Design a protein with these regions (language model features):
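Conserved acyl-donor/pantetheine-binding loop and adjacent beta-alpha core of acyl/acetyltransferases
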Residues: 77-138
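Conserved GNAT acetyl-CoA-binding A-motif
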Residues: 133-135, 162-174
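Helix-loop element at the rim of GNAT/NAT acetyltransferase active sites that forms part
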Residues: 19-36, 48-49
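Conserved acetyl-CoA-binding loop-helix of GNAT-fold acetyltransferases
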Residues: 138-141, 147-161, 183-187
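Conserved N-terminal entry element of GNAT/NAT acetyltransferase domains
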Residues: 1-12
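Conserved beta-strand in the GNAT
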Residues: 59, 65-74
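Active-site rim helix/loop that mediates acceptor-substrate recognition in acyltransferases
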Residues: 35-57
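Conserved catalytic-core motifs of GNAT/GCN5-like acyltransferases
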Residues: 77, 124, 171-173, 186-204
Length: 206
């Protein structure tokens, strides 16, 4: 029987963050075939969290190999300021001449465009759901861990860590085509806060 455990993330987990993010990046499905550069999606949705607030990153591993993670930021506005000042500038320089012939799909094109989207922490802070739900999270599990209660365990672990920081509201974004994820988040206490073109913003008070 496989041994499954949840632990705090280490910097050495970074390759797994990239891999898991890519293999779940197609609304929960493997997005490997959608990218010429397999690291692009993880550069935005996974890796920065390990460097910004690693104590809010946790992995679920099977037989010692990470196969899922949850990554959070306790203050989304502060996280966005850090992205703008520290994380995104090198990526913007690196990908500014990213050859169009290398971009395989619109998914990859849109992912690269995220690096150049100007974040406005001051404006975001005015949104009512940021006041009530200042934290946010991303969670991804490979199929090998799905249906084993590890998604629930990861989110509960993150919730406990947020409460330790006196943070009681958290939000996330989910594609409207990912019905399974939406149902899971509702079971975890998340409710829809607003609709975007790409999907739903959901929040939970913990």
């Amino acid at each position: 029987m496989a041994a499954i455990a949840i632990r705090g993330a280490e910097f050495s987990d970074l390759p797994y963050f990239y891999e898991i993010c890519l293999k779940t990046g197609g609304a929960g499905n493997d997005a490997s075939s959608l990218f010429y550069d397999p690291y692009i999606i993880g550069q935005y949705y996974a890796a920065p969290y390990l460097f910004f607030e690693r104590d809010l990153c946790f992995v679920a591993e099977m037989d010692g190999v990470p196969q899922g993670y949850v990554a959070g930021a306790s203050d989304t506005s502060a996280f966005n300021r850090w992205l703008e000042s520290e994380w995104l500038p090198p990526l913007r320089r690196r990908y500014q001449n990213y050859a169009h012939e290398k971009i395989k799909t619109d998914v990859e094109k849109n992912s690269v465009a995220l690096f150049y989207k100007k974040l406005d922490p001051a404006g975001e802070a005015e949104r009512s759901f940021y006041k009530t739900y200042p934290a946010h999270l991303h969670i991804d599990l490979l199929p090998s861990l799905q249906g084993k209660g590890q998604g629930k365990a990861l989110i509960k672990t993150l919730f406990a860590a947020l409460v330790q920081k006196n943070v009681h509201g958290v939000h996330l974004g989910v594609s409207r085509t990912n019905a399974g994820a939406i149902a899971f988040y509702r079971k975890m206490g998340f409710a829809s806060l607003k609709e975007e073109k790409w999907g739903l913003v959901m929040g939970a008070y913990i």
